[in-house]
Amino acid sequence: FEPVVKDGKLWARGADDDKGQGFIQLKAFEIAVKEGLLRCNVKFLIEGGEEIGSPGVEAFCKEHLDLLKCDVILVSDTSMVGLDTPSITTGLRGLAYWEIEVTGPNRDLHSGIFGGTVANPINELCKMLAGVVDENGRITLPHFYDKVETVSTQERAMLGAVPYDEEKYKAAIGVKELSGEKGYSTLERNSCRPSFDVCGIW
């Protein structure tokens, strides 16, 4: 639908996620050009399929490596620490996704008849997954942290200064306690440290 300005705010499909952010970036660069502040070339890659995995983007990037060469990447789709707190995200953790297939008997076995005699694939998978994160919240996969950057003293100070209410965070997601890697704050774990999460078993 057509964008409409109401009470000084832009209402439109995607205004919040993510066309609004992209529009802000475009306007910022427009101002920089008009004011003579831009000292480099800028390239825009805009696509609208992020919510379905951005089909075609990977192939496009591989086919146009020279065109897309750059020193810095600016991304629109990031979070804010609060509705009233403007936020600049200076880095993203990235994503690695795997599917693990565990095989067993040639059919679904009745646990009352076969239980205790045959390894249950789901039980075996749970054993594997249970060992991936230790009691301190650290991921045990070999070399997992080899290229993970250390949270700097400056970054920790900046995150520590962010107006953040952990109790409100817990209430919003309906939990009594938070967990994760020991030695880091919730914001540090959520923004600077890697995590291991199981997204489904079927």
Language-model segments: what does each one mean?
Residues 34-37, 65-66, 105, 127-138:
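Generic secondary-structure signature for well-ordered alpha-helical cores
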Residues 19-35, 54-61, 119-131:
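Active-site-proximal alpha-helical scaffold in enzymes
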Residues 81, 90, 111-201:
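Acidic-enriched catalytic cores of C-N bond-cleaving enzymes acting on peptides and small amides
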Residues 39-120:
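Histidine/acidic-residue-rich, glycine-tolerant segments that coordinate divalent metal ions
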Residues 1-43:
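Active-site metal-coordination/substrate-binding segment of hydrolases
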Residues 7, 48, 78, 200-202:
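Short, well-ordered turn and helix-capping elements at secondary-structure junctions
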Residues 4, 8-10, 16, 49, ...:
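Short glycine- and Lys/Arg-enriched binding-loop motifs that mark or flank ligand-binding interfaces
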